[in-house]
Amino acid sequence: MLTGYRLMWMVVMFDLPVITKAERKAATGFRNALLDVGFQMSQFSVYLRFCTSQAQVDTLCRQVEQALPAGGKVHIFQFTDKQYERAISFHGRSRQPAQKAPDQFDLF
């Protein structure tokens, strides 16, 4: 059974150089690679993805690693769904409700 302690969230945070045209192209390619594997942009350099298992997190970590540009810093954080639901978010000065995990399908 999937529980909030097995379900995971991944957060990829990065600071990439964008001085030269080649660096901007590499940074855009990295952002697009994150979108291609199902991440959502939370902020310009912060991307989130919901995962159903640690194995899926491990697979996505390898995919992110393969897409890394030559320069810059990239951090990948992993949180259980229970930990992530405690996140506090604001839009301006308005507190936002916690982001919900996507619905799971039941297979018989």
From Swiss-Prot:
One GO molecular-function entry: metal ion binding
Keywords from the UniProt entry: Antiviral defense, Endonuclease, Hydrolase, Magnesium, Metal-binding, Nuclease
EC top class named in words: hydrolase
Annotated positions binding Mg(2+): D15
Superkingdom, taxonomy of origin: Bacteria
GO terms under biological process: defense response to virus; maintenance of CRISPR repeat elements
EC number per UniProt: 3.1.-.-
General function of this protein: CRISPR (clustered regularly interspaced short palindromic repeat), is an adaptive immune system that provides protection against mobile genetic elements (viruses, transposable elements and conjugative plasmids). CRISPR clusters contain sequences complementary to antecedent mobile elements and target invading nucleic acids. CRISPR clusters are transcribed and processed into CRISPR RNA (crRNA). Functions as a ssRNA-specific endoribonuclease. Involved in the integration of spacer DNA into the CRISPR cassette.
Family as reported in the entry's similarity comment: Belongs to the CRISPR-associated endoribonuclease Cas2 protein family.
Self-association and partners: Homodimer, forms a heterotetramer with a Cas1 homodimer.
NCBIfam families: cas2
Protein name in the entry: CRISPR-associated endoribonuclease Cas2
Organism the protein comes from: Paracidovorax avenae (strain ATCC 19860 / DSM 7227 / CCUG 15838 / JCM 20985 / LMG 2117 / NCPPB 1011) (Acidovorax avenae)
